[in-house]
């Protein structure tokens, strides 16, 4: 179904249960499976349109592979390599530096706790501001309007929805 843009309102509309085979633990207008760039963008936009949204992610932080272990961490390390190369290149300008000492543990800590963590915490805050419910667990469709989620703590939850977006990479 096509989501039509509604007038901005601070009130979320009431969500009615959708047709399903068993009772859901929670009901949403939109369920998004996967919290990478496509998933969180879709979830945030749906929430901005006034829909009640749940974002289901198997890992403990939103942002997907790109943000957590792929593109962003790799680019952070590449940036450090470029800084070293740029410093070496200044010798032609008459400025030279001693050979850098690389502390891999500190470099990894910077990448994980300064770069990646800052971005994932920003996304979590944006989800909270938009009242997007984030559920940590693995979701599988149980019916056309339900997803069974095995939560990361081992519990199970059934999510009812009107529309779903699969953004699992």
Residue ranges and their predicted role:
Residues 40:
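Residues forming the Rossmann-fold NAD(P)(H) cofactor-binding site
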Residues 1-3, 35:
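Mobile cofactor-carrier "swinging-arm" domains
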